[in-house]
Swiss-Prot record:
Catalyzes the formation of 5-methyl-uridine at position 747 (m5U747) in 23S rRNA. This is 23S rRNA (uracil(747)-C(5))-methyltransferase RlmC. It comes from Yersinia pestis. It is an enzyme of class 2 (transferase). The active site is at C334 (nucleophile). Transmembrane segments: none annotated.
Length: 376
């Protein structure tokens, strides 16, 4: 993959861009195998990968420059702006959208935030595309509500230029820190959920809910989880740290007793919407802390699926699972190092199979799916 900004030394987000892609996969697989070297693994499956470019469904753009000539991209270490509108990780559909958005910023008078001077209003633009129908979700991250009325007044022009804009919102982030978004989200369109579909399973993305940024590989990850669960004829399961419910909704059959737990209420609203659309009657989702929920339960299902943030599931949940001993633990991780530490704490379990999913080409990061079975 060629990137002009990488070649010029202005962007190093893709740290491994100089490394041939087959070597990237081999290095990631070696890293994963070394982390689990102390455990017996029954089956290592070949890594799953997708496109090497144009695979991202989301852009996080720092807004800089002036209101008349805004720049979208990132800030270099020395504070100079780097234009990322032509980033090869984005689909071709994004660049013309960015062109319109630059014009809109000028029309609406949305002054870009200046980090050095701590002045201005528009900090970020967050753009997400649905691979299901091509609709877009756009979030304006503002320092305050000062320019909100101007933004709303100018929206009809933007919606006319970009009819695929289905979900628009403003996020208020008043803190002068490298924090992407604040707690307050202001909806600017009636529709506030972007429809997506993986493997015939309807999913929804709301402004403040997490969603995988590589749809092609994410669809393979969910399909693989479903296959592994179905092979063991599981009738009851938990989906902890469930997000919008992607794993649980793929794995649950009409008779499966599924409980999905996620701290983010927006994500839970998405999961419930999907479950209702699928007609699943034995499925429930709740906006709770996953560890607190689990450790308060006196009974355990046959399978516990966990998809934690980078910190892993931690000792408290590992101790609980070891004590309660579900037949299966399906662990999906975006940080194999914390997953390996957690597995070492899960007494009484054997690693049945492991598979790497390269969600993040040209970087050292990857996702991994691991099936643990209780030793008989």
């Amino acid at each position: 993959m060629h990137c002009a900004q990488y070649t010029a030394g202005r962007c190093r987000s893709c740290q491994w861009l100089d490394k041939p892609y087959p070597q990237q996969l081999a290095d990631k697989q070696h890293h994963l195998e070394s982390l689990l070297a102390g455990h017996a693994v029954t089956q290592w499956l070949a890594p799953v990968f997708g496109r090497e470019s144009a695979f991202r469904n989301k852009a996080k753009m720092v807004v800089s420059g002036s209101v008349e000539r805004p720049l979208l991209g990132m800030l270099h270490r020395d504070g100079t702006p780097v234009d990322l509108c032509a980033c090869p990780l984005y689909p071709p559909s994004f660049e013309p959208v960015f062109t319109v958005l630059k014009t809109f910023i000028a029309r609406a008078g949305l002054t870009p935030y200046n980090v050095a001077r701590k002045r201005g209003e528009l900090k970020f633009l967050l753009l997400t595309e649905s691979t299901y129908n091509g609709e877009l979700m756009l979030r304006f991250v503002l320092r305050s509500e000062t320019k909100l009325a101007q933004l709303i007044a100018a929206l009809p022009w933007l919606q006319q230029q970009l009819p695929q804009l289905a979900v628009i919102s403003a996020n208020i982030q008043p803190v002068h820190m490298a924090i992407l978004e604040g707690e307050r989200e202001i909806p600017l369109t009636e529709q506030q959920a972007l429809p997506e579909r993986f493997n015939q399973v309807p999913l929804y993305i709301r402004p403040q809910s997490f969603f995988q940024t590589n749809p092609q590989v994410a669809a393979s990850l969910y399909a693989t989880a479903r296959q592994w669960v179905q092979e063991h004829e599981v009738h009851s399961m938990w989906d902890l740290f469930c997000g919008v419910g992607g794993f649980g909704l793929h794995c649950a059959g009409p008779e499966t007793q599924l409980t999905g737990i996620e701290i983010n209420a927006e994500a839970i609203a998405c999961a419930r919407q999907s479950a209702e659309q699928l007609g699943l009657k034995n499925v429930s989702f709740a906006a709770l802390d996953s560890t607190r929920f689990a450790t308060a339960e006196a009974q355990i299902p046959e399978l516990v699926l966990v998809n934690p943030p980078r910190r892993g599931i931690g000792r408290e949940l590992c101790d609980y699972l070891s004590q309660m001993a579900p037949k299966f633990i399906l662990y999906s991780s975006c940080n194999a190092e914390t997953m390996a530490k957690d597995i070492s704490l899960l007494a009484g379990y054997h690693i049945e199979r492991v598979q790497l999913f390269d969600m993040f080409p040209h970087t050292s990061h990857y996702e991994v799916l691991t099936l643990l079975t209780l030793r008989r």
